Design a protein with these regions (language model features):
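Bacterial N-terminal signal peptides that target proteins for export
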Residues: 2-13
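N-terminal leader/linker segments that initiate helical-solenoid repeat arrays
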Residues: 23-66, 70, 76-90
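Terminal, low-structured helical/coil segments at or just beyond the last alpha-helical repeat
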Residues: 26-39, 184-192, 198, 215, ...
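Short coil/linker segments at helix-helix boundaries
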Residues: 48, 52-60, 84-119, 126-163, ...
Length: 270
């Protein structure tokens, strides 16, 4: 092959390569194959729900949490969060029937969470928080029946995490409520359930003081301790603690209601 033929051959090859490159440049890059995103989606949904939860936007939080539940129905912490939203909606509900319905929804999710996570303090406490919130809307029989689950829930949560201030708070309220049980309710409960436990306001005080020591930033601890002192006739201590709690910024969904109860207690002290 002479030099002229070689040059022509090289030119042909070069032209062919350039043509292929031009065609390749006109073809858009293929879309990357998407990776499975279930776990990422769940995490994103929970983060979105948590953001709404911090703002006490229960309906918006539920939208994200319930969507996440469809992907991870056995996520105990997620079920705890869902139960909390139904309790928050209880606070905003305007009828007893709606409050009870929402409370029952919260109970269902709380029980599921506790069953799935026997070693998780928050999962165990969810039952006690929910039952305690429902007491105001229940009759004597239901209130008596709820006493045991509330106590066991708080005890389990504290055993798993001694620094769970909410658990100490719930236990304090339990002691105060049991100490206040009158003769008729106690007799009624004993006839149906054999016996009712006994407790004292002093035991309640110890629990609320523990909650304050762990987390002094929550007004409900101070107000409920003050209300307990009011039950004990310690008016100065009651005024001091309730007044302190009323001056603190809200940190929990039920703080406005708790503060109103504190104001009512203060009024009765004067």
């Amino acid at each position: 092959m002479n030099s002229s033929s070689s040059i022509k051959s090289l030119s042909a090859v070069a032209a062919l390569l350039l043509g292929c490159l031009a065609i390749r440049a006109q073809i858009p890059d293929a879309e990357p194959v998407p990776k499975p995103v279930d776990s990422v989606t769940v995490a994103d949904l929970i983060l979105k729900g948590d953001a709404c939860d911090r703002k006490f936007k229960a309906n918006e939080a539920l939208q994200s949490y319930l969507a996440a539940e469809k992907l991870e129905p056995k996520n105990a912490r997620l079920l705890v969060s869902i139960a909390r939203q139904y309790r928050h909606l209880m606070t905003d509900a305007t009828t007893r029937e709606k409050k009870v319905m929402l409370g029952n929804m919260a109970v269902g999710y709380s029980l599921r969470a506790a069953a799935l996570a026997p070693n998780d303090s928050e999962a165990q406490l969810a039952i006690g928080i929910t039952y305690a919130k429902m007491l105001l809307f229940q009759g004597t029989k239901e209130q008596v029946a709820a006493s045991g689950p509330i106590k066991r829930s708080a005890d389990a949560a504290i055993r798993l995490d001694p620094r769970n201030d909410t658990a100490w708070h719930i236990l304090g309220r339990w002691h105060r409520n049991v100490a206040a049980v009158g003769g008729v309710k106690r007799v009624f409960g004993s006839l149906i359930y054999g016996s009712l436990p006994k407790s004292t306001n002093e035991a309640a005080v110890a629990c609320f003081e523990k909650a304050i020591a762990i987390n002094p930033q929550r007004p409900m601890h101070h107000i409920e301790l003050g209300r307990t002192y009011a039950e004990m006739g310690k008016k100065d201590d009651a005024r001091r603690l309730i007044t302190k709690g009323l001056a603190m910024p809200d940190t929990d969904k039920d703080d406005p209601q708790t503060k109103q109860q504190g104001r009512e207690t203060l009024t009765k002290l004067h």
